[in-house]
Regions:
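Conserved beta-propeller blade signature
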Residues: 37-40, 74-76, 84, 127-130, ...
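Extended non-catalytic domains of envelope/secretory-pathway proteins
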Residues: 4, 33-38, 49, 127-128
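Short loop/turn segments that connect beta-strands within beta-propeller blades
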Residues: 5-9, 50-54, 87-90, 141-145, ...
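Blade-level signature of beta-propeller repeat domains, shared across WD40, Kelch, NHL, RCC1
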Residues: 157-182
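Loop/turn-rich, solvent-exposed surfaces of beta-rich toroidal or solenoidal domains
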Residues: 77, 107-142
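Low-complexity, polar/charged sequence tracts that form flexible coils or short amphipathic helices
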Residues: 39-41, 49, 58-61, 76-78, ...
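Extracytoplasmic beta-rich repeat domains
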Residues: 7-35, 43, 54-71, 94-123, ...
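Loop/turn residues immediately N-terminal
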Residues: 1-2, 44-47, 80-83, 134-138, ...
Length: 182
C-alpha cells in the first residue's frame, strides 16, 4: 500500500507491504477508511493504521469480509461466523458471539444447518445487515444490546456486488435478473 502526496510535491509518504513471503499474490479485502484511520484485512488478520502509516493494532482474526466501522466500533464477521465488535482505539474485542447462538437465543430456532457462511456485512440505519451465501438476510440491532431483529430467507442467490440507492438494495441473481429490495 502506498500513501502518495499528489497535491504539493508529488512524492511517496510511506509504503507498506502486507504480502507474506510464501504468497505469490496478496489477497486482501477492500481497504476500509474512516477519518484518519485505515483498516487493512485479509484472510489471516485485521490491522488499523493511522494516516502516517503507523500501526495502531493488529489482530489475528481470519475473515473474508471487509470490516465495517461506526464511531469507535469495528464490526467483523470471522470465518467461523462469529460476530466481533472491536474497540477502534485499542483493538480490544468488546463482544464476540456465534451468529448461530444469537439466532437460537433470539428466535428459539436452530438454523445452523440452514444458514451458511456470511458473505456480506453492512451497517444500515444503526443496524447490521448480514447476508449469507444462501440468501438469508439477518438484521441485527446494535444500539443498546446485540440481538437479532429479523431473519428472512430470500428465494434467490446474489451473484453481484450490492448497491444501495434511495433506501433500496439492488443486485443481480444467478440467472442475471435484477432485484430491488427495500
Amino acid at each position: 500500500m502506498y500513501s502518495l502526496n499528489l497535491i504539493n510535491n508529488k512524492r511517496i509518504n510511506w509504503i507498506k507491504n502486507f504480502k507474506q513471503e510464501s504468497e505469490i499474490i496478496y489477497e486482501g479485502n477492500p481497504i476500509t477508511v474512516q477519518n484518519d484511520n485505515i483498516i487493512i484485512s485479509n484472510k489471516n488478520s485485521i490491522s488499523l493504521f493511522n494516516v502516517n502509516g503507523n500501526k495502531i493494532w493488529d489482530l489475528n482474526i481470519k475473515s473474508t469480509l471487509p470490516p465495517v466501522i461506526s464511531g469507535n466500533t469495528v464490526f467483523v464477521v470471522n470465518k467461523d461466523n462469529f460476530l466481533l465488535l472491536i474497540n477502534k482505539n485499542d483493538g480490544l474485542i468488546k463482544y464476540s458471539k456465534s451468529i448461530n447462538s444469537l439466532i437460537t437465543k433470539d428466535f428459539k430456532k436452530n438454523l445452523k444447518r440452514k444458514i451458511k457462511k456470511i458473505d456480506y456485512l453492512y451497517l444500515i440505519d444503526g443496524k447490521l445487515l448480514l447476508i449469507s451465501k444462501n440468501s438469508y438476510f439477518i438484521e441485527i440491532n446494535i444500539k443498546d444490546s446485540v440481538n437479532i431483529n429479523s431473519i428472512k430467507k430470500n428465494p434467490f442467490e446474489i451473484s453481484s456486488d450490492i448497491i444501495f440507492l434511495n433506501k433500496e438494495m439492488i443486485f443481480i441473481n444467478k440467472s442475471n435478473r435484477i432485484y430491488k429490495v427495500n
